[in-house]
Amino acid sequence: MKLTTNDLFASQPLFHCPCSSSSRPRRRRFYGLHFPINLTSEKNNSLSIVALSDSDLPSRTAFSRRAFLLAPPLLVSAASLFLKPSVSLASEESSSATVTSPAESAAPPPPPATTTPSPPPPVNKEETITSRIYDATAIGEPMAMGKDKKKVWEKLLNARVVYLGEAEQVPTKDDKELELEIVRNLRKRCVESERQISVALEAFPLDLQDQLNQYMDKRMDGETLKSYVTHWPAQRWQEYEPLLSYCRDNSVRLIACGTPLKVLRTVQAEGIRGLSKSERKLYTPPAGSGFISGFSSFSRRSTFDMSLPTQIVPFGPSSYLSAQARVVEDHTMSQVILQAVADGGGTGLLLVVTGASHVEYGSRGTGLPARISRKFPKKNQVVVLLDPERQFLRREGETPVADFLWYSAARPCSRNCFDRAEIARVMNAAGRRRDALPPDIQNGLDLGLVSPEVLQNLFDLEQYPLISELTQRFQGFRERLLADPKFLNRLAIEEAISITTTLIAQYEKRKENFFEEIDYVITDTVRGSVVDFFTVWLPAPTLSFLSYADETTGPDSIDALRGLLGSIPDNAFQKSLAGREWNLNLRIASVIVGGLKLAGVGVVSSFAAVGASNALNIARKVIKPELVVAEKPKRSPLLKTAMVYGGFLGTSANLRYQIIAGLIEHRLSDELSSQPLLVNAISFVVRTLNSYFGTQQWIDLARSTGLQTQKSIPASKEISEALEEPTVECDTTTEEESIDKLNNQ
């Protein structure tokens, strides 16, 4: 029976896959050509052509004609299989239904693109912002902004007018510091974006604009400008002077937007009707403007708040005149602001420094933003309240009192001082639980007094087993490490200097008797190390939450003393912490208290050193009686030595270590935080010089008070003096060393 083409291909399918799990390679045969193509599924996916033996076919001549007829189509099929990439064949072997066209299969894979990595863009180092910022538009409690203040600056820069509302009932200098901080940062960003920035001040009446222009052009000094604001309180000029000087030195335009005093006093005394016709046209809103200013917008709060007795204010003649004065103030400032915005072009930024009551509730209130919003888009105005006394919980549907609440770092806070979400992230990253932290840290977190940075520093330090054990057991050690993570470096530098210089001085003095008198050497070295430890420990800055966590009860006098000591910083130059403000009196008290502590250390160490010397002398006489001499050497008086040495540590040493720990190692190290090697080198040099000059001061003091004699001593008595006289000097100098110096002279 003659086979047809259909019978040939139907008898053995092209993609026939046997179901048996044989390890042999599967073959796909094209019987018409007698060249079966073996498609193996091995790693190389190679294609091989296996020749059939003669026994596989009945005869060669029977199908020569069929071979000739089937050759062209089968050659095309074979070529397509050869041109298929190995990846497509492997996918077919794994029963994928994807069919690739020959043209697509023949296309070579594209070469891998070689992209040169572009250099990373320069990262602008953001200025450290120590103040606290809250988003007042959040529902519920105002939300603390994290350490990343980019969103705040972006919103301020996107506005055309930024209102800075100062405290009016109880003015504070912290507001002026915040204003300078905000102006400085905004001015830096406006210079980068080539925008003009101006500052409008309500404190300056608009009739003083010429004087402000002369001050900006440096044709008038500060004292002359001060003579035009004699109506200010005495301290207000000192508070405004840094802001005025910065604006003048950095070409930030100053605008006077306050109501002239004559007009304001006339309205307060007689009302608007007391103004002339021309003054009414300039300083009063047109009839039918719809604003009745001077009263709080109670509709922004709940009915419960409106019913409080403290909110009810009787309306009398004086209140009516005050309301009219408020209308005049708001209208005058709004006109100046609109003109300043127009003068600034389409991209200028205007900062308005005014009272908080003039800007509360923004465009939905009754103050400046509401008046300007009629001629100005609402989204181009941002309201910032500086150091507000209260934080309201915003309910759904209520108008926020402002866009941001901005607190100075020194202002006390009762809740949510730091971003709690950031604190939770730090806790989760470290795998720590709040109940496993020390009690003072837990209460500090509950009150919002522990920043995420401080918490991260604590976790980093606890990675070392020894430091972790010390921080968990000793609160004083933990407080100093939190305030200064390099506290151990300072302590190690001081101890290394003390021990090294003491041993060198002892060896130079005793020379060949150094090891024979090793007991005296050890006594002096240990005493100097203990004293140096406390001179580093006591003046060191601390970050303490003990006053918040300590809930123990005791006598009133003890509580009062504990509260007094808790309010005093450990170092006079320590930076103000969140919720604490240390004035000049408290910093002076810090020096006094620190001096008393070091004086106590000096008295105790003197008693201990003299007692140890006497005990060693007695033991030496018992062990080596041949060292006993007939003449008893002169000894320094015990009580006098202790009092003089305590006074020396409480005055000279206290002041020197306050400066080193506060100014050099606390404030200067923060400025040079990016160069730790330089900071450590400066600390080492300063402490070495301090040890040297401190020793010289103690020698002069000991001689002037009679603790050390200056007369010549015979050489025969030199050994007995060196063996028996107790040491009373600071750190490295002994009494015997000073005597030898005199003998050499």
Curated annotation (Swiss-Prot):
Q: Where is the composition biased (Acidic residues)?
A: 721-738
Membrane topology, as annotated, equals: Multi-pass membrane protein
Transit peptide limits: 1-50
Question: Where does the record say this protein resides?
Answer: Plastid, Chloroplast membrane
Which Cys residues form disulphide pairs? none
Feature: compositional bias, Pro residues: 107-123
Ranges of Low complexity composition bias in the record: 94-106
Q: Which Gene3D superfamilies match?
A: 3.40.50.11550
The entry's family comment says: Belongs to the RETICULATA family.
PANTHER family given in the database record: PROTEIN RETICULATA-RELATED 2, CHLOROPLASTIC-RELATED, PROTEIN RETICULATA-RELATED 6, CHLOROPLASTIC
The entry's protein name is Protein RETICULATA-RELATED 6, chloroplastic
Q: Which organism is it from?
A: Arabidopsis thaliana
